[in-house]
Amino acid sequence: MDQFIKQDETGDLIETGMNVANHFLSAPIQGTNSLSKASIIPGVAPVLIGNPEQKNIQHPTASHQGSKSKGRGSGVRSITVPPPEAGNGGTQIPEPLFAQTGQGGIVTTVHQDPTIQPTGSYRSVELAKIGKERMINRFVEKPRTSTPVTEFKRGAGSGCSRPDNPRGGHRREWSLSWVQGEVRVFEWCNPICSPITAAARFHSCKCGNCPAKCDQCERDYGPP
């Protein structure tokens, strides 16, 4: 025999369902508790208790959010940038272009051609360009001493160690800058066994074969 729900019973079921919905909307929800028979108020229709574990509503608390963000942040590594040229050693030249003779180097000024006087907003740029060209040509015209280039042979010698320097020697270095409308050059000598660095530095001999002074840097230290 079929059972039919009367119209007034349908209204009662709808009203009961609305009461249950209002109850759960107004009651505080605990994240660790699930919907069970004990959480439903007495008097509601038994059909609404068919599957109490169907929905388990959980709201993350502040502690959960903190631990979640902390977990993501733990995978981020901080990048540490080493100081430039930290392992090159040597002594930094603080003011190479204002140094005086007798401190291990010589300061010279590359004089400009008096007939060439650029004007305008790019005057300093043009003067610096002219001074650089004249400085380069001045050094190119002078004879330079160079170390002999050995032929490369695969597997010969130790690949990681510095090549032997039985004779030793010095190399001339220059530091160029634009100072107060003039191109100034500071030049000095370093042992050929020392590294070549971007910053102006005094280096000491590492191989034990480089002389303390050479014919190029004798005048750098002033009169004897």
Curated annotation (Swiss-Prot):
Organism name: Mumps virus genotype A (strain Jeryl-Lynn)
Role of this protein: Plays an essential role in the inhibition of host immune response. Prevents the establishment of cellular antiviral state by blocking interferon-alpha/beta (IFN-alpha/beta) production and signaling pathway. Interacts with host IFIH1/MDA5 and DHX58/LGP2 to inhibit the transduction pathway involved in the activation of IFN-beta promoter, thus protecting the virus against cell antiviral state. Blocks the type I and II interferon signaling pathways by interacting with host STAT1, STAT2 and STAT3, and mediating their ubiquitination and subsequent proteasomal degradation.
Protein name: Non-structural protein V
Principal location: virion
GO BP term (any one): symbiont-mediated suppression of host type I interferon-mediated signaling pathway
Binding site for Zn(2+) 2: C193, C205, C207, C210
Record GO terms (molecular function): metal ion binding
Gene that produces this protein: P/V/I
Subunit composition and interactions: Interacts with host IFIH1/MDA5 and DHX58/LGP2. Forms with host DDB1, CUL4A, STAT1, STAT2 and STAT3 the mumps virus V-dependent complex (VDC).
Family listed: Belongs to the paramyxoviruses V protein family.
Chain sites annotated for binding Zn(2+) 1: H170, C189, C214, C217
Pfam families listed in its UniProt record: zf-Paramyx-P
Keywords per UniProt: Host cytoplasm, Host-virus interaction, Inhibition of host innate immune response by virus, Inhibition of host interferon signaling pathway by virus, Inhibition of host MDA5 by virus, Inhibition of host RLR pathway by virus, Interferon antiviral system evasion, Metal-binding, Viral immunoevasion, Virion, Zinc
GO (cellular component) term, any one: host cell cytoplasm
Positions of the UniProt region annotated as Disordered: 54-98, 145-172
Polar residues bias locations: 54-65
Location in or out of the cell: Virion; Host cytoplasm
